[in-house]
Amino acid sequence: MPSDDSTLPQPVLLVEEGLELRQIELADAEEMFMVVDANRGHLREWLPWLDGTNSIEDEVSFIGTTLEEYGRGDGALYAIRLDGDLVGAMSLNWIDWGNRGCGVGYWLSTEHTGRGIATRCCVRLMEHCFDDLGLHRFVLEAATENFPSRAIAERLGMRLEAITKDREWLYDHYVDSALYAITEPEWRSRD
């Protein structure tokens, strides 16, 4: 659990004018499902959960689970909103308060990839994790062949720590994973 002087991620993290990370709510379920459904082919390439998200009810259930995790201090899920529209999601998939570490995950709709949105949102979430939550280590894990996500980690100055064999089952095959991390002192000393 968080210490008394830290708080879980705030409900809204302003990234820049018009771009924000907004804590997901049950009221977002329909919009989230519509974006997921419209981008199913694109997202399926790297995300293993698409076959379990086939209705708004599935999305409601997923959001309910993430809100429970948030309440326990175990994680957080944000809608990535650009000019008010939901264009993707970013999450703290896990928070280890004892070791002061966390892991990030994200996805964007097809038309919003390649514009630096995920990178800028990661920077804002890292700032919050290090500055406000007092975390020490920030982890990003991506399939070894997911070059766009790996490039984000590298742009952020994260260190490649491991390649893990057969890390994740992706519908009909295993994929290897690249594990990147950066510590708070490394983050502060970059550039």
Regions from the language model: what does each represent?
Residues 1-31, 35-42, 77-191:
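Acyl-donor (CoA/ACP) binding surface of acyl/acetyltransferases
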Residues 26, 37, 53-60, 74:
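Generic alpha-helical scaffold signal
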Residues 44-64:
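Conserved GNAT-fold acetyl-CoA-binding loop/helix
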Residues 46, 50, 73-77, 136:
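Short, polar/charged, Gly/Pro-enriched helix-capping and turn/loop motifs at alpha-helix termini
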Residues 61, 65, 124-127:
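Generic recognition of well-ordered alpha-helical segments
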